[in-house]
């Protein structure tokens, strides 16, 4: 399961999406997330699915790789769907057993929430798959730079977020390595119920924390040896600049959000 977690991984390429400015991809992802919560009809969700499919296709990412990012959180998606199915109020009861009942409204709401989570994760995965950590840091820093006037440390925040994102696959690889080493010594992580498996994971914590601190120290030494002193006075080999493809991407995602907003509230405004 650990090998199936793809958060923080970068897939090199030269597609339309890879060549976009990182600021464009970050803002487009945020706008798409807003658009997800504007959707309220099957047609709107169909448009969102089609748009996500188009972006994945244009990015030339392996479809299996993109959907692999969903595997570790399928249980969360399923639990979210079930909770909404059983707790949402409704009149048309589809299933009833003792105190539990599933209504048509609950089934629809649960399906909507599950689809929203899937779309959110898929689109966010495209951002990390098509943007290297260094470029992502530059993009976040540029977006946060206007807030420096109120004391926001733009460069430091961007660096921390990127290092944290990059450390996720590193720590997962380390966890997998420790599990294999302990399995070779007779440890069993696959048998037993959920509680027993969780208890079997406890011996992993100490070596994992030790490894994490060691890697953090190695990273700090490497940055210091390269004379890293923060963002002040730093220059870059490649300066970020918006191009025609960035404006095209902005126009597409803004049209998507505006169109979904019009579908949701347009009829109400016309009635007024």
Range-by-range predicted roles:
Residues 51-61, 76-79:
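Alpha-helical transmembrane segments and their membrane-interface exit regions
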Residues 73-187, 194:
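Juxtamembrane/interface alpha-helical elements of multi-pass membrane proteins
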Residues 41, 45, 60-64, 88-96, ...:
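Transmembrane helix-loop junctions in multipass membrane proteins, especially transporters and channels
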Residues 25, 64-74, 246-249:
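Alpha-helical transmembrane segments and their helix-start/interface "positive-inside/aromatic belt" motifs
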Residues 1-44, 48-57, 142-145, 149-152, ...:
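Transmembrane alpha-helix interface motif
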Residues 14, 37, 60-65, 97, ...:
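Membrane-helix interfacial "entry" motifs
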